[in-house]
From Swiss-Prot:
Gene3D superfamilies: NADP-dependent oxidoreductase domain. GO terms for molecular function: D-xylose reductase (NADPH) activity. InterPro entries: AKR, AKR2D, Aldo/ket_reductase_CS, NADP_OxRdtase_dom, NADP_OxRdtase_dom_sf. Substrate binds at H112. It catalyses: xylitol + NAD(+) = D-xylose + NADH + H(+); xylitol + NADP(+) = D-xylose + NADPH + H(+). Catalyzes the initial reaction in the xylose utilization pathway by reducing D-xylose into xylitol. Xylose is a major component of hemicelluloses such as xylan. Most fungi utilize D-xylose via three enzymatic reactions, xylose reductase (XR), xylitol dehydrogenase (XDH), and xylulokinase, to form xylulose 5-phosphate, which enters pentose phosphate pathway. The active site is at Y50 (proton donor). The record marks K79 as: Lowers pKa of active site Tyr. This is Probable NAD(P)H-dependent D-xylose reductase xyl1. The keyword Oxidoreductase applies.
C-alpha cells in the first residue's frame, strides 16, 4: 500500500501519511518501525527528544537488509532539540543523530521548538530534555536566525535534503522568511479538530510550506501524560460528529480524522502497533469527505492546545520561582 505525496519547495516529494515515533517504547521501537515498513509506511517522524533513534535505525536497517526497501524509498525526519540551537552545535548533533539512525542524510531536519536552551553535552545526558544539569530551565541567548543559518549549512553539506520548523507561530514564520537563504520546507504543528489553527495553516501553505499535523487524535495522545485538559475533554473518537461521518463512509473515526487533514493537504503522522490499524491509518486517501463534513469537523475547534510542555512536565512552579512569572511557550 502506498500513499500520495506532497511536493516540497525543496523539490522533494514527502508522503502525506507517515509513522510518528513520539512515545514509541525503546523495547519495541525497532520491531514497530520494521513492521510499519512492511505495511507500506515510508515516512518516519523522529526526534532527538524521543530518545529512540538508535532503535528506529535498527528497524530501518533490518528492512533494508531484507530487501523490503532501499534507503531512497524512505523519508526519514528528525529534529534539532532546544539544547543545540547554538550555531556551532547544530552540525555535530545532526551527525550524531544520523549515526544513531545509521543513515547518511535526513530527508527532513526540523527545528523542534523556537526555544533555545542552555547546551547540555550529550556525553552527560542524552536526550537532554527541558532541564539543565541543575534541574532548572535555563535559556540560551541564541536567536533563531543564527540557528537557521546553521540549519542551511546542513543542506549545503548534504546532511539534510530539506529543513523545516515545528511549533512556530505565524509571526515567527514571517520573520524567518524575511532572511532565510534556504526556505523552510515544512511546518509541523499540533493540529486536530479541537485545535485547527486555520489561519496559521493557510498562511504557511500560502508561503509554500507543507504542513504536517501531529497529535491528530487530539486528547488521546496526552491521556497517559496525566494532562488535566486531556482527561476533561471528550475523545474525538467518540464525538457524535465524527462517529456519524465514520459510519456514513464505512470508516473508523481515526480514518475520518486523518482524512480531514490529508484532504486539505495536511500531512499526518499517526502510529500504532496493531497491524489492522496500521493499514487503516495508511489508507486515508482512498475516500473523500464532503465539503460540509469537513466544515462540521472544523467547527469543533476550541483553540485547545494539549502540547504545552510547561504543563506536561510540571515545572511551571519552578519557573514562577525562578522568574516571578509564567513563561509561556505558545
Amino acid at each position: 500500500m502506498s500513499t500520495p505525496t506532497v511536493k516540497l519547495n525543496s523539490g522533494y516529494e514527502m508522503p502525506l501519511v507517515g509513522f510518528g515515533l513520539w512515545k514509541v517504547n525503546n523495547d519495541t521501537c525497532a520491531d514497530q518501525v520494521y513492521e510499519a515498513i512492511k505495511a507500506g509506511y515510508r515516512l518516519f517522524d523522529g526526534a532527538c527528544d524521543y530518545g529512540n533513534e538508535v532503535e528506529c535505525g535498527q528497524g530501518v536497517a533490518r528492512a533494508i537488509k531484507e530487501g523490503i526497501v532501499k534507503r531512497e524509498d524512505l523519508f526519514i525526519v528528525s529534529k534539532l532539540w532546544n539544547s543545540f540551537h547554538d550555531s556551532e552545535r547544530v552540525e555535530p548533533i545532526c551527525r550524531k543523530q544520523l549515526a544513531d539512525w545509521g543513515v547518511d542524510y535526513f530527508d527532513l531536519y526540523i527545528v523542534h521548538f523556537p526555544i533555545a536552551l542552555k547546551y547540555v553535552d550529550p556525553a552527560v545526558r542524552y536526550p537532554p530534555g527541558w532541564m539543565s544539569e541543575n534541574d532548572k530551565l535555563e535559556f540560551s541567548n541564541t536567536p533563531i536566525h543564527e540557528t537557521w543559518a546553521a540549519m542551511e549549512k546542513l543542506v549545503d553539506l548534504k546532511l539534510a535534503r530539506s529543513i523545516g520548523v515545528s511549533n512556530f507561530s505565524a509571526q515567527l514564520l514571517m520573520d524567518l522568511l524575511r532572511y532565510a537563504r534556504v526556505r523552510p520546507s515544512t511546518l509541523q504543528i499540533e493540529h486536530h479538530p479541537y485545535l485547527t489553527q486555520k489561519r496559521l495553516v493557510d498562511y504557511a501553505q500560502k508561503e509554500g510550506l507543507a504542513v504536517t499535523a501531529y497529535s491528530s487524535f487530539g486528547p488521546l495522545s496526552f491521556l497517559e501524560l496525566n494532562l488535566k485538559d486531556a482527561h476533561e475533554t471528550p475523545l474525538l473518537f467518540e464525538h457524535p460528529a465524527i462517529t456519524a461521518i465514520a459510519e456514513k463512509h464505512g470508516k473508523t473515526p481515526a480514518q475520518v480524522l486523518l482524512r480531514w487533514a490529508t484532504q486539505r493537504k495536511v500531512a499526518v503522522i499517526p502510529k500504532s502497533n496493531n497491524p489492522t490499524r496500521l493499514a487503516q491509518n495508511l489508507d486515508v486517501t482512498s475516500f473523500n469527505l464532503e465539503a460540509s463534513e469537513i466544515e462540521s469537523i472544523s467547527a469543533l475547534d476550541r483553540n485547545l492546545r494539549f502540547n504545552d510542555p510547561l504543563a506536561i512536565t510540571n515545572f511551571v512552579s519552578s519557573l514562577c520561582a525562578q522568574y516571578g512569572f509564567y513563561a509561556p511557550i505558545f
